């Protein structure tokens, strides 16, 4: 993140953040976003492109970009990297078959220059499903302990029940604000 970007954000009275939500298809990105925003989650279909939600939380204006995760759409992810303050990587904890794909795609993102400095929150979603991998198992599978380029945190959660969505988002906001906003 360049100095001008930091200065611009410090001057803004309205503390506005750009969050990018990515992950493989069917990980639960849209469900997390809708649940966090208090919307109905009964009928959610795959995101073919992207959704943008703007919501207020803890005095922040959050612009959350929810981008489809189908293999055919992943090459377009780079179009959304610019000015990203926080990256939310959503993992389907019950999808053991694709954990290696998930790890590879995350590693590809973390070397992107335009995401340098962005705080990383990993939501280990679908913890309510039988057979879901624990946060620690996902931490190992995704080799998270090797990440040195970003501040990161893994949070087990359930988009369906809403469990642990708030603590994850709160950690993300705390980390971002400690980096880019001056104390009031």
Swiss-Prot record:
Homology family: Belongs to the small GTPase superfamily. Arf family.
Any GO BP annotation: adherens junction assembly
Function: Small GTP-binding protein which cycles between an inactive GDP-bound and an active GTP-bound form, and the rate of cycling is regulated by guanine nucleotide exchange factors (GEF) and GTPase-activating proteins (GAP). GTP-binding protein that does not act as an allosteric activator of the cholera toxin catalytic subunit. Regulates formation of new microtubules and centrosome integrity. Prevents the TBCD-induced microtubule destruction. Participates in association with TBCD, in the disassembly of the apical junction complexes.
Tissue: Expressed in liver and retina (at protein level).
InterPro entries the UniProt entry points to: Arl2, ARL2/3, P-loop_NTPase, Small_GTP-bd, Small_GTPase_ARF/SAR
Protein name, UniProt field: ADP-ribosylation factor-like protein 2
GO MF annotation list: GDP binding; GTP binding; GTPase activity
PANTHER family xrefs: ADP-RIBOSYLATION FACTOR-LIKE PROTEIN 2-RELATED
Principal location listed in the UniProt entry: nucleus
Stored Gene3D superfamilies: P-loop containing nucleotide triphosphate hydrolases
Residues bearing a lipid moiety (N-myristoyl glycine): 2
Residues where GTP binds: 23-30, 66-70, 125-128
Locations listed in the record: Nucleus; Mitochondrion intermembrane space; Cytoplasm, Cytoskeleton, Microtubule organizing center, Centrosome; Cytoplasm
